[in-house]
């Protein structure tokens, strides 16, 4: 009895101990599980908060990007409108420039035609000038030959002999300076005078721009001073408005050459002297009347 009772008591204690251990094990396991669950929940909460914060930041950035996109769309629309307006503006300017270019091209063609016409006229004038220069040279050569023939074989000037008078005129186009030469005589008071006067006038558009008069003759040596004074007086007598200071007078004295076929000079007398009086005036001086020519 006592042994079975003791065994029952031991069994009961053991069951109590076993039950207590099981309860403690279960409790410790539950506590551990609760702690693990709590830690996991804390971590999940932190992760959730972080995810919410990240989501919030993402939403904020998305909103900012939406605003920026709308702003960029507005800028794009503004740029498109500006581009369209600029295209229209420059298209109008291009049309205006094309019109101006067409006008300038027409003017250029007209200028080229005018230049070609002027070149043709200039060439014609040059040809005319060259032809007239040849004619002038021919007439000058004829006059020089006539002068050499006249002065080479005649003994001095005689009262009953008068020097020949000739007049040569050239009519050129109005754009070219005309040169008119005419020959006249100077009054003679001495037997041995042989005098001829040549006047040249340069005319531009009907106005005298330059004039020169040249008197040429062979006189006796002892009468040089008197003849020169007489010639000078005759120039200013025909032109009372002409002042002596406004013209340029120059006297050239040369020993007259004696031709073998002409009159021989005497050794006792002084040789005759060739005298040339040259008078020039410019366009700023009053006009000189051309000497009267013999018919």
UniProtKB/Swiss-Prot annotation:
Keywords: Coiled coil, Intermediate filament, Keratin. Disulfide bonds: none annotated. GO terms for cellular component: intermediate filament. The keyword rRNA-binding does not apply. Pfam families: Filament. The keyword Lipoprotein does not apply. Residues 2-150 form a coiled coil. One of its GO terms (molecular function) is structural molecule activity. Residues 1-150 form the IF rod domain. Belongs to the intermediate filament family. This is Keratin-like protein KRT222.
